[in-house]
């Protein structure tokens, strides 16, 4: 089995296993201790859409068509997305008998035929682009005509402007359910967190618990989520035959933090 846990805008030094003195990440630290730290792990681009396209396809963004001089990332009103002729990790594994699930931020197209379920994923639950791309979350002039942020289940919008403080918890519940539901067959889970991209939100139980303010709270909730995924693998007897990779799309957006 394969599990990729993917964060948005997390910095190299935001984890205690990489030297952060105040943010506690015991579950991710355990992964680093029991597995390996990938210290020369390059992203395809320094922003979200092309980096994610590179991850999904194994191709440079300039070749998969999702990087250009005028627009670096897709927006809610973008008319394009990852092309149907691109071969994704999910598509290859699906064709070879794997159950495939995507949870969280996609950012490779906000509508069909560009959604995860159009690119080899059996199921999808999440927000199709960055959490600041709505007039509710972004007061910039460019966002005035953006639609409300949709929460999508497979190919259908089920909510508008979901409570972002509950996203990490809800994503985690879906990820754990996917693991349990497919514990008797090979699976690929792509779990792409919305955070710590700004604006920052965390569940009430994590507010004020870190020594690094709201940003630290958000990262520590993500670490809790990693622990829940690892626990689900262990409890279902999958921890010895599952590759788990924890990484991010690019470095931090320092001015926003």
What residue ranges belong to the model's regions?
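Formylglycine-dependent sulfatase
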Residues: 1-257
């Amino acid at each position: 089995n394969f599990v990729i846990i993917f964060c948005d805008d997390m910095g190299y030094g935001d984890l205690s296993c990489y030297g952060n003195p105040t943010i506690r990440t015991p579950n991710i630290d355990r992964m680093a201790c029991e597995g390996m730290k990938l210290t020369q792990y390059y992203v395809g681009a320094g922003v979200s859409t092309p980096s994610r396209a590179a991850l999904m396809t194994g191709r440079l963004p300039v070749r998969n068509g999702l990087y250009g001089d005028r627009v670096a990332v897709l927006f809610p009103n973008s008319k394009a997305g990852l092309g149907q002729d691109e071969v994704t990790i999910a598509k290859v594994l699906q064709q070879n008998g794997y159950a495939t699930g995507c949870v969280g931020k996609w950012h490779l197209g906000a509508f069909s035929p560009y959604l995860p379920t159009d690119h080899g994923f059996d199921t999808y639950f999440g927000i199709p682009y960055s959490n600041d791309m709505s007039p509710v979350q972004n007061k910039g002039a460019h966002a005035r005509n953006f639609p409300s942020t949709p929460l999508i289940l497979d190919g259908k919008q089920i909510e508008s402007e979901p409570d972002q403080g509950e996203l990490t918890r809800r994503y985690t519940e879906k990820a754990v359910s996917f693991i349990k539901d497919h514990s008797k067959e090979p699976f690929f889970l792509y779990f792409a967190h919305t955070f710590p991209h700004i604006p920052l939100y965390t569940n009430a139980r994590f507010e004020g618990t870190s020594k690094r303010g709201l940003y630290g709270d958000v990262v520590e909730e993500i670490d809790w989520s990693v622990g829940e995924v690892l626990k689900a693998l262990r409890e279902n007897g999958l921890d010895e035959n599952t590759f788990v990779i924890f990484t991010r799309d690019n470095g931090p957006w320092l001015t926003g933090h």
